[in-house]
């Protein structure tokens, strides 16, 4: 079982169509599972914010915020783009860590460059943090 940890920054990269800096990983043919991890699991990030860490519009549990901390990310290979919405925005990094999204699996038929990135079509210059992904070949 092959495993790697990739840290995807939410910081701006104005040369990319996504507006943020993609991380490109060359993967061999096979089935892979992506897990969002945090710093306690060897990641470089716990969560990311698209609004300088501002929090607003949360429910009483600290979830479903209009602005907050999140784990949403996307990845693409060939003509495929997969957006993993995460679990929405949360009122704290701690709450976001407690509410990580479910694992995502995909299969590659050939050796392929896969790009991982966060999507912020608004203003990526006010982003903080990033998302850490563990990619495991099954």
Kindly label every feature range from the protein language model.
Residues 1-138:
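Acidic, Ser/Thr/Pro
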């Amino acid at each position: 079982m092959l495993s790697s940890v990739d840290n995807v920054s939410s910081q701006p990269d104005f040369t990319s169509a996504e507006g943020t800096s993609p991380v490109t990983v060359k993967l061999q043919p096979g089935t892979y599972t992506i897990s969002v991890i945090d710093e306690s699991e060897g990641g470089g990030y716990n969560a990311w914010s698209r609004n300088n860490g501002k929090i607003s519009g949360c429910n009483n549990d600290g979830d479903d915020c209009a602005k907050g901390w999140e784990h949403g990310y996307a990845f693409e290979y060939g003509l495929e783009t997969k957006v993993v919405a995460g679990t929405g925005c949360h009122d704290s990094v701690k709450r976001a860590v407690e509410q990580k999204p479910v694992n995502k699996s995909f299969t590659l038929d050939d050796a392929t460059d896969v790009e991982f990135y966060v999507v912020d079509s608004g203003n990526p210059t006010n982003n903080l943090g990033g998302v850490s992904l563990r990619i495991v070949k099954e």
